[in-house]
Amino acid sequence: MPTVVDVLLEQHLSPQWRGLLRALAAEFAAQLDREELRQLMFRVGERFAAEHPLPACESTEALAAALNARWASIQWGCVELADEGDYLRIVHYGAPLPAFGGDALAWTPAFLQGSYQAWLDAMGASDLTVVQAGVPEDGYAVEFHLARATA
């Protein structure tokens, strides 16, 4: 039985891209190990962020609004930000990462990670690091933490 994520993906991913994305992911996985794939997707995310800069934001609320406007413009879900004291929690919902196939969920979220890192660096948070908090089970919700890098 299809999951909610499967249904949403089916509705929002053009059929012309499904086979290509899965074949691309399979070929990437055949040529690169998991860490290399994460590094590649992180760099792709950085490039995406550089090509789609955010406006200056003076608050967490303004940042969330800018991020959500950016993701909504390409139908890539939405984000929630929460100040947890020693880190900023970033939860991204509804990115079409499952389009690459279930096995790719181990490395495709690095695209989001690289995007968030680049945007936050551009806003002056270059002394902080975006890290992924676990591997998403279904790819619908991906959590990241923005915090000081640990040695």
Model-derived regions: residue spans:
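N-terminal accessory segment detector
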Residues: 1-89, 95-107, 139-141, 150-151
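Long, amphipathic alpha-helical coupling/dimerization segments that relay conformational signals between
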Residues: 95-132
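Beta-rich nucleic-acid/ligand-interaction surfaces
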Residues: 129-148
